[in-house]
């Protein structure tokens, strides 16, 4: 008969979460509190993890941006990052990085999803809605679709 499993210690549970992916301090705290005897115990563990550099809000932000930047715009990613209560300095750095690459990321997503200029106003509106729902700015979306329209017009002239 197999022996019953010992419950994981709080530290083992935290390291298990961190071994799978980066977590923000707020997110890891939320996951650990139900398994702890007190909130102070969790805070002490989180302080220790940060001291050992096993928990880092900066690394979490970089990881999240790396995972999701190809599918979402700056506005959407910043909204998600703000829910993790990262520092203003970290958020500012991430926002600057995202804004510098937003046009390239938006163009790549647009080409993957649509690949051709809109044929009429209804299709144009659909493309704009799709891109804006993913957090890309109106100006970037307009430039990409306008650029696609110009490519279509240039193609018509060469025929």
From Swiss-Prot:
Listed name of the protein: Regulatory protein RecX
Keyword terms of this UniProt record: Cytoplasm
Cited Pfam families: RecX_HTH1, RecX_HTH2, RecX_HTH3
Gene label: recX
Biological processes annotated in GO: regulation of DNA repair
Family statement: Belongs to the RecX family.
GO cellular component: cytoplasm
Main location: cytoplasm
UniProt function note: Modulates RecA activity.
N-terminal signal peptide: none
Family annotation (InterPro entries): RecX_HTH_1st, RecX_HTH_2nd, RecX_HTH_3rd, Regulatory_RecX, WH-like_DNA-bd_sf
Keyword Cytoplasm: yes
Subcellular locations according to the entry: Cytoplasm
TM segment ranges: none
């Amino acid at each position: 008969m197999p022996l019953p499993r010992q419950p994981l210690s709080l530290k083992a549970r935290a390291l298990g979460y961190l071994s799978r992916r980066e977590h923000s301090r707020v997110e890891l705290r939320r996951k650990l509190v139900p398994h702890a005897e007190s909130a102070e115990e969790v805070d002490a563990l989180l302080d220790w993890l940060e001291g050992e550099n096993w928990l880092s809000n900066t690394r979490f932000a970089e990881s999240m941006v790396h995972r999701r930047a190809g599918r979402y715009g700056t506005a959407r990613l910043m909204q998600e990052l703000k829910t993790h209560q990262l520092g203003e300095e970290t958020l500012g750095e991430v926002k600057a990085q995202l804004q510098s690459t937003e046009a390239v990321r938006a163009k790549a997503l647009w080409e993957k999803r649509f690949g051709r200029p809109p044929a009429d106003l209804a299709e144009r509106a659909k493309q704009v809605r799709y891109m804006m729902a993913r957090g890309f700015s109106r100006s970037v979306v307009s430039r990409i679709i306008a650029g696609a329209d110009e490519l279509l017009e240039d193609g018509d002239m060469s025929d």
